[in-house]
Structures are given as C-alpha cells and as structure tokens.
Amino acid sequence: MAIERTFSILKPDATERNITGAINALIEKAGLRIVAQKRIRMTRDQAETFYAVHKERPFFGELVDFMISGPVVVQVLEGEGAIAKYRDVMGATDPSKAADGTIRKLHAKSIGENSVHGSDAAETAKIEIAQFFSGNEIVG
C-alpha cells in the first residue's frame, strides 16, 4: 500500500474539551504520522469555502457557525493508506453507530459535534491540505 497524506480537523467540540492530545494519541497509535499541525480560528469565509460541497444542504449554516465557534486544529497526516486508515480511526459520523475504540465513539458529542473531519479521497485531501498549509509547513 502506498504512503499517502490526508487532511484532518479536530473540531471546536474537541478543542473546547481539551481532548486534542487524546485524539492525536489515537491517530499515532493507528500508525499515522502528524507531519503538519496548527491551531487556528477559522473565518466564516474559510468555513464556507471548506464546506461548499454542503452549501445547498439544510445544515450548512449550522455547520459553518459551529466550525467558527472556537479554535480548531488542522493537520496533515501521513502513512500507508492514510485516507482509509484515518476514516477507520474516526469512526462513523453518528457516534452511536461508530465502532468501539474510534475517535467518534470515544469523544464525539453528537452527529453535528463529532470531534473530527477527515478527507474522503486523495483529490479531496490535496485540495483540503492546500487550503490551510503551504509546502514548507509540511515536514515529513
């Protein structure tokens, strides 16, 4: 399996509860390396651009408001099959349906406040990474 990079966000519900270290430990335990990481406060424009794919969905406004409600941690993760591996580590969007031991089963508050985001495909990962990181910020 090829070494890949994927994009991750530790959302405001995670930073608010000071559980970013616990989430990072689960990421690293899964064999993924954190090759870039920074704590930011997303602007409304950043959140709307990032979640533009959901613009016509009824939850779009609430999602954007949530993502700008507090600091987030944006990350680039690297490892073999990183995209699929991180999606497995995150667990199902609905924490009640997430597998035991996953980030969302352990830490998510609800479907909306589900602690983490991860890219769903290689092309998406490239786009998402470029929205928040320049090349010299990614140190593998």
From Swiss-Prot:
GO BP annotation list: CTP biosynthetic process; GTP biosynthetic process; UTP biosynthetic process
Catalytic reaction list: a 2'-deoxyribonucleoside 5'-diphosphate + ATP = a 2'-deoxyribonucleoside 5'-triphosphate + ADP; a ribonucleoside 5'-diphosphate + ATP = a ribonucleoside 5'-triphosphate + ADP
Keyword Aminoacyl-tRNA synthetase: no
Keywords: ATP-binding, Cytoplasm, Kinase, Magnesium, Metal-binding, Nucleotide metabolism, Nucleotide-binding, Phosphoprotein, Transferase
SUPFAM superfamilies given in the database record: Nucleoside diphosphate kinase, NDK
Main location: cytoplasm
Reported cofactor(s): Mg(2+)
Keyword Magnesium belongs to the record: yes
Name listed for the protein in its UniProt record: Nucleoside diphosphate kinase
Gene: ndk
